Amino acid sequence: MALGDLMASRLVHSSSSSAAPSAALPNHHTNHLVDDHLPVENGPDPRRDVPDEEPPPPPPPQVALLPQVVVLCEQRHEGFDEAAAAAAGPSTSGPVSKWRPKDRMKTGCVALVLCLNISVDPPDVIKISPCARKECWIDPFSMAPPKALETIGKTLHSQYERWQPKARYKLQLDPTLEEVKKLCNTCRKFARTERVLFHYNGHGVPKPTANGEIWVFNKSYTQYIPLPITDLDSWLKTPSIYVFDCSAAGMIVKAFLERLDWSSSSSASSSKDCILLAACEAHQTLPQSAEFPADVFTACLTTPIKMALHWFCNRSLLRDSMEHNLIDQIPGRQNDRKTLLGELNWIFTAITDTIAWNVLPHDLFQRLFRQDLLVASLFRNFLLAERIMRSANCSPISYPLLPPTHQHHMWDAWDMAAEICLSKLPQLIADPNAEFQPSPFFTEQLTAFEVWLDHGSEDKKPPEQLPIVLQVLLSQSHRFRALVLLGRFLDMGPWAVDLALSVGIFPYVLKLLQTSAMELRQILVFIWTKILSLDKSCQVDLVKDGGHAYFIRFLDSLDAYPEQRAMAAFVLAVIVDGHRIGQEACANAGLIDVCLRHLQPENPNDAQTEPLLLQWLCLCLGKLWEDFPEAQLLGLQSNAPEIVICLLSEPQPEVRASAVFALGNLVDIGSPSLNGADDDSDDDEKVRAEINVVRSLLQISSDGSPLVRSEVAVALTRFAMGHNKHIKSVAAEYWKPQTNSLLKSLPSLANINSSNVYSPSSLIQGSSGLASHIGPVLRVGSDNSATARDGRISTSSPIATNSIMHGSPQSDDSSQHSDSGILLRENASNGGLNYSRSRPIDNGIYSQFIATMCNVAKDPYPRIASIGKRALSLIGVEQVSMRNSRLSNGGAHPGETSVPPSSNFGMARSSSWFDMNSGNFSVAFRTPPVSPPQHDYLTGLRRVCSMEFRPHVLNSPDGLADPLLSSSAAPSNMGLYILPQSLIYRWSCGHFSRPLLTGSDDNEEANARREERERIAMDCIAKCQRSSCKMTSQIASWDTRFELGTKASLLLPFSPIVVAADENEQIRVWNYDDALPVNTFENHKLSDRGLSKLLLINELDDSLLLVGSSDGNVRIWRNYTQKGGQKLVTAFSSVQGYRSAGRSIVFDWQQQSGYLYASGDMSSILVWDLDKEQVNTIQSTADSGISALSASQVRCGQFAAGFLDASVRIFDVRTPDRLVYTARPHAPRSEKVVGIGFQPGFDPYKIVSASQAGDIQFLDVRRASEPYLTIEAHRGSLTALAVHRHAPVIASGSAKQMIKVFSLEGEQLTIIRYQPSFMGQRIGSVNCLSFHRYKSLLAAGAGDNALVSIYAEDNYQVR
C-alpha cells in the first residue's frame, strides 16, 4: 500500500473531528434515548392517566451504565509548559545535529610517488617464482622499463581520477628526496586548507626502517635515500591522507602515531586531520602469489570491482568455466546503474557502506564515509582490501583503526551478486543487444528491511539495511517502495530520524524535491515532516534549494488529504521559524494568500476543515508574521485578521490557540525608542485591524482551555509592550494617588473574580472598559435595571459610555481583613526605554485590557496567572497591601488573614512583584469626581475594598515594577527578552515527532484495562442491585485532621481509596482497606479558598479528579493517588463573567455527554463541554439561584436543578426550550434544595429532592408535579443527600449528628448516630455523603471532628 493511502486510513492526530460549531449545544453524543424527551412543563402527557404503565424497555445495561466517552486525554492535557514545549519542538543544536558533518572537506591535490626501479629488486626482498608482477594491472616487464614506469604512473593517475576528477594530480616516478619535498610543498600550497592525498608505492625500494623512514633514490639511482616521516609530515601538513603500499608498511603507521602523540599537546586537531592507510602490518610482507597483482593493495583501493571479481573467480563454482579475461570485458559504465558494470559498482557501494555503518561508531562513520568523497571511496575499498589480503595472511591497517570486517555476513550478499554477474557475462558478451536483467539484490534487501519494520523497535538492533535504502533512492525503479519504507521507519520516532540522517539520507531526499513525479509528493512531504520535527536547521538547505516552493504547491493542492497538507503547512512553518530568508522567500511565493484561502471554506455549508490543517495553517501564518513587519502588512492587506478571528470559536482548542498565536503576531510590539517619538508609518487600516484583533482576544480571555488562555495572555502582553506608554498613561489617570482621598462604592478586582465576575465580552460592550468593569457599582443617576438578569453590564448605563467614577480610600477604622492589591507606579518621563507604537488607539481598549489582565493574573492555571502578573508589571501595576471593609452582611472568607494597619507603609522593593501565593488583586480606580456617589449602588454589595496609597521611593526611573525594564538597568533591546514566550508552536511540533501511522501499544493496554473494569463494574452492579443496602457496618474511620472539617468525599470505583477535601481545599487520599494515607496536596496556593465538590472523570479509564471550588474555579488532576505525583490537567473558571454567582457554585458531571454543569446564585446554568473545552449557557428562568445540580446517568444532556426557593427543574440541552419540567415539591416554608438526584436504575423519569428543612420528596416527572412519596427525614438542618447510582437506596445527613438510609419505597433501612466504639461517641455533624458507584458503600464526612467514615452491609468483606 502506498504511504499516502496508508496515511489516509491510519493517520492518528490529536485534533478530533466534530461538526461545525453552533449557538446551541449540538447533539454530538448519540444516545439510545435521544428522541425520548421528558414532557414539557404543563404540557399534555397521556401517560399521566395510566399510572401502571410500564416504562419503555431498558437499554442494554452495559451501554447505559458504562459510558464510552473519554475526555481530557488529548496531548494538550499531558502538559504544555516550557519544558514540554522545548522537548516537543525541533532542535537546532545538541545530539540531533551531530548527523550533519561540521566541516565538509574535499581532497584538492593528489601526490603520486612511485618508487619501482623496474628490473632491479630491493636487497631485502627475495621473490618466489612465479610471483606477482603487475602494477596497475600492467606487467612492467612487457615493455622497456622507462616506458613501463611512465605507463604505470599514468594508469595510477587515471584510476584515482575516477574517484576524484576535480583534484590536481602530481606524479613523481622514482624520485629523489628533493623532488619529493618539492612535490609535497607544491601540493600543500595548491590545496591550501583542503586535504592532500599522498600515495607511496615502495615496491622497488627496501622496507621502511624501524624509525618509520621510507626510501627514495639519489639522482644517479645508485643509492637508497631515507626520508624521515617527520619531514614528510612537516611538508604536507594537515589535513592529509597517506596511502603506503609497501611491505612492513605498519612501521610507517607506528612512527606516525608516535609523532601524533608527541605533538598532540600543541595541536589537538592534528590527529583527526591525518588519515593513514597501509598495506600490511609492521612484520608482514606483501603477497607474492601470482593470483594477485604486485600492488594488490592499490588495486583494491582504486579498481575494487575488477580486483574483487578476479579474486572471487578463483573461489566461485564457476571458476572452471570462467575465463579471467572476460572480467575486463564486462559491458557498461561504472556510473550507469542500468548496465552490468554500473549495477555491480552500485551493489558494492551499498554493501561496503552497510558494513561500515553497522560496524563503526557513528561519529567515525560520519568522518570517514560522509565528510570527503575521495576518503569515503578509499575506505569502502579498504574494506575489500582487508577481505582479500587477509586471505593471503596479510592484514591492511588504518588510522583511525577500524574493527575487523572481513567476515561480515554482507560479503555473502556480495558474493551472490558477483556470481549472478559472472553467470550472465558470457551471454552478454556474445550478444551485446541482449536485454539486461537487474540483480534481485536491492529488491531482497528492501524486503529484509520491511521485515525489520514489522518486528523492530527502538529497543532492538537498528536495521542494517538502512544504508542500502539510501542507495536505492538513486534508482527510479525502486524509489517509491524505498521511500514508503523509509517513511515507515522515520515514523517510529526521533531516534529513527536521527539514524536516517546519520546514515546520510538528507542530500538524497533534498534532491528528490526537484523531481516532478506526482506519486512521490505525499511520501516526500511525510519524510520531510519527520526530518524537520527533529532538526530545524534543515530549513536553510530547503530555502537555498528552493524546496519551499514544493511544499507551497502541495499545500495549495486540493487533491491531497487534509492531514498531508497539514504536514506541508508544518514544514513551511519550520522553514520560516526564526529564519528571515525563509520568511522572505515564502512571502514572495504567496504563502500568505494560500494559507488564508484554505482557512475559510468556499461554501459556508461545507463540512469543517480538518482541524489539524487549520491548526498548522494558523501556526504557519503566525511564524511567517513573527517579527516580520513586511509580512504583517501583507496579511493586513489580505484581510487576515477577519479570516483568522473566525477560528476563535472552533471546537478544537488547538485550533483556537493557534489562531490566537497568529493574531498575536499581527500585534505590533513596537520598537525601542529613547525619546518616545512617534513613527508616522502606521496608517488607519493597521490601527483598525489591531483594535479588531485585541477586542477579539479580550473576548476569549476566559476560554475553557488553558492552552488557549495561555496564548491569549501572551498575545495581550505583546500588546502591552507595543502600547506600553499609552496604557501606562491611561492607568495612571485612573490610579493617580490622591492623599487622604476616600474611595467609595468600588468593588475590588478580587471580588470581580468571585462574587462580582465580569466577562471580557461584557466589558467590550461599552466604550469605556474600566467603567463597564465596575459599572453596577459606580453607575450614577441610574437604577439596578441597568444590570441584566445574568449580571452582565448594560451599555445603556450612562457610566458605561463615560469616564470612570472616582473616590478615595476609606479611613483606617475599616475592617482589618487583608487582601492583595495593585498599585500603578507612575512613569517618570526621563527619556528611558519605552516600547510603544507610534499612535495610541481607543482608550476604552486600554481600559478593557487592564481589567482583563487583572483577571488573567488570578487565573487558576499557574502559568497563565504568571503571564498576567508580568503583563501588569509591564504597565507599572504592582502589588501593595490592601485593606477591605465588609458590609454588615459580609465576612471574611476562609484563608484570609488580618494584617496591621501599618502594612501599607514603606513597602519594600521586593514587593513590586505579585505575591505568587495570593489570589486577591484589588484595584482602586481614581479620577476626579464628576458627581457625588450614590448610595443606592451600595445595596447588595458584598465587599468594598479600600486602598491607601502611601509615598514610597520609586527605584525604577520609568515606573516599571521590574528592574529589568529600567533604562538604567537594561540595554535598549532588553524589552524584547522579557516578553513571555508562546508555547503553542513548539508544543504542536511534538505531534509530528510521534508515530502517525501506527497505534500506540499504550492504547492496547488501556483497552484491555477498560474491558476488565467493565466486567468488574457489571458484576458489582448486579450484586448491589440485589443487596439489602442496610449500611449498618462501619468498615473504616479516618481522622483527616482537617482544621475546618470534611467538606467533600469521594469513593474510587476500582480501588479501596477515598478522597476527601476541606474548605481550605486540602486534598487527602486514603486507603481504607489498609488504613494508610496515600497522598496529600493542596488544590492551589492562593489565599482565597473554599470547596464545593469532588467529582470523578473517566472512571473506567485513567480517572481524573475534578475539584470544584466555591468561587467557580475548576481544577482537574491526574495521578492524584500517587504520593507527590499529582499533576494539573486543566483549570478554568466555570462562571467567569457572572457577577452575582457568589461563592456557592455547585457542579455535577455527566460522563456520557462529557458535560460539566455549573451554576450558583445566578440566573444561568453553564454547560461546559470538556471535550471542546467550550461553554454554553442555559437560562434557568427562575427568580432565585441554584443550590443543587444532578446530571442524569442515563440520558445525555439531561440534568436536574434544585433552587434556593425550594423549586425543582429538569433541563435537556437537546430540546429547543431546554426546560422540560418544573415542580415545587417542598412546602412553601421550606428552605433551599440541599440535594437532588435521579433515582437509581434505567428509569430517567424519577428524581429525589431534599430540602434544608429536612423533607425528601420523590417525583415522577411523567405524572403531576406533586411528589408521589414524601419522607420527613430530619426535623430541619438537612445538610447532605446521596443517591446511589445503581442500588435502590438513598442516604441523608443532618447537622444534628445523624445519618439515615432509606429504600426507594421510603422505608428507613438504617440510622447512624454513634461511632461503633465502646464509649459510643456521636458521629458528628454531617457535611457530605457519597455512595460508591458500583458497591453498597457509603462515605460520610463530618464537619466538627473531621472524620470520614465508611459504612457497608454486614457481609462486606475487606479484600
From Swiss-Prot:
GO biological process, alphabetically ordered: cellular response to amino acid stimulus; cellular response to starvation; positive regulation of cell growth; regulation of autophagy; TOR signaling
WD repeats mapped onto the chain: 1041-1080, 1087-1127, 1139-1178, 1181-1221, 1228-1269, 1273-1312, 1321-1359
Function as written in the Swiss-Prot or TrEMBL entry: Component of TORC1 complex, which is an essential cell growth regulator that controls plant development. Acts by recruiting substrates for TOR. Acts by activating transcription, protein synthesis and ribosome biogenesis, and inhibiting mRNA degradation and autophagy.
GO cellular component labels: cytoplasm; TORC1 complex
Biased composition (Basic and acidic residues): 32-50
Family assignment from sequence similarity: Belongs to the WD repeat RAPTOR family.
Designated name of the protein: Regulatory-associated protein of TOR 2
Residue stretches of biased makeup (Low complexity): 806-819
UniProt entry keywords in alphabetical sequence: Developmental protein, Growth regulation, Repeat, WD repeat
Region (Disordered), start-end ranges: 17-64, 782-819
